[in-house]
Amino acid sequence: MQIYGWKVQVRGDTLSEMELNLNYIVDEVVKRLKCEEKDEGILVEASGRHVHLSKEAVELLFGKGYELTKKRELSQPGQYLCEERVTIIGPKGTMHNVSVLGPERQETQVELSKTDALAIGVNAPVKMSGDIEKSGSVIIATAKSVLKLDKGVIAAKRHIHITPEDAKRYNVVNNEEVNIKVEGERGIIFTNVAIRVSEKFNTVVHLDYDEANACGFTKGMRASIVK
């Protein structure tokens, strides 16, 4: 017999055996059909300049015992935008109203685009979030206090947060680097995109504003993994 164009043979000496084999064939056909469904790609998000603050930094900048105020949830579970804003000061310029993201981190980190870093005269090496060794320095200020950050300024390496299920689906593993293709008027292929796999993640591509501008980013844009 043929099912959706595939020629299959149902084997078995008894009716029950034939029914079991047929059920297996139907399951396999369903799996194949799912694999052949058009992949809509992975949602792309653009991340602007922001800071992650340690508990010590929060208390220095806002006061003893101060707790960050959640404004809205972000795409990754447990991550959120705060009501608080800070000023970033470099040798060549100042950036006001910079977002603070919660919750508190073990170490303070400032994420800028390369354009931002150039504008205020700071070094922002391309690194994964959390890797602040040999990174740039900057001053973080509020109306209450000033923090001189000796290290912690980075340009975040473009990456994909991905669930284990989606990692298996796309045949990628944690810490692997892939290429992604973004379609559109300014379609582009980004290389060296890091894979970060965790059950705690939602599957999303994260670009900074320089990268987002390069591909003509619009809300709802999607990217496909190219190997």
For each predicted feature, which ranges?
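Short, low-complexity, charged amphipathic interaction modules
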Residues: 6, 12-37
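Short amphipathic
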Residues: 40-51
